[in-house]
A protein has these predicted regions:
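Extracellular receptor-binding modules and their adjoining Ser/Thr/Gly/Asp/Asn-rich linkers
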Residues: 1-49, 114, 118-124
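Extracellular attachment/recognition segments
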Residues: 36-112
Length: 124
């Protein structure tokens, strides 16, 4: 695997605490839209959009991971939107909701508004 580079513009490598970390509880959407993958270098569409501001990060999101929903029924894959090579997203994330028991994406139109998940995000 070839390494493209290290995010030196974002002060990486760095000790913990050099950049803001955020924990945010995010409610699911009332009507989920399945992810449609983008072309190479293009963000996917659909899913649940979460802004950098909703994560408490005023400038950008560099990394994010979800703990999954409160009842264990769902997990989430976090995508940078847009993904900027060697930089962060100045917009936010797209969340792809997955059913924990099968690993399949949640169907379109499913109401996830009663579910909450926690996201750890690092940014600036």
């Amino acid at each position: 695997m070839a390494v493209q580079g290290v995010l030196t513009n974002e002060q990486f490598p760095c000790p913990p605490g050099n950049l803001p970390w955020s924990l945010a509880d995010i409610k699911g959407p009332a009507s989920y839209t399945q992810i449609t993958p983008g072309a190479a270098g293009v963000a996917p569409t659909g899913g649940q959009a979460v802004s950098k501001e909703a994560l408490g990060l005023p400038v950008s999101v560099l990394w994010a991971k979800s703990m999954g929903a409160e009842n264990g029924q769902y997990d989430v894959v976090c995508y940078m939107s847009p993904f900027n090579s060697l930089a962060g997203s100045q917009t936010g994330l797209i969340l792809q909701w997955m059913t924990s028991s099968t690993g399949a994406e949640v169907g379109g139109g499913v109401d996830l508004s009663t579910h909450t998940l926690r996201i750890l995000a690092i940014g600036r």
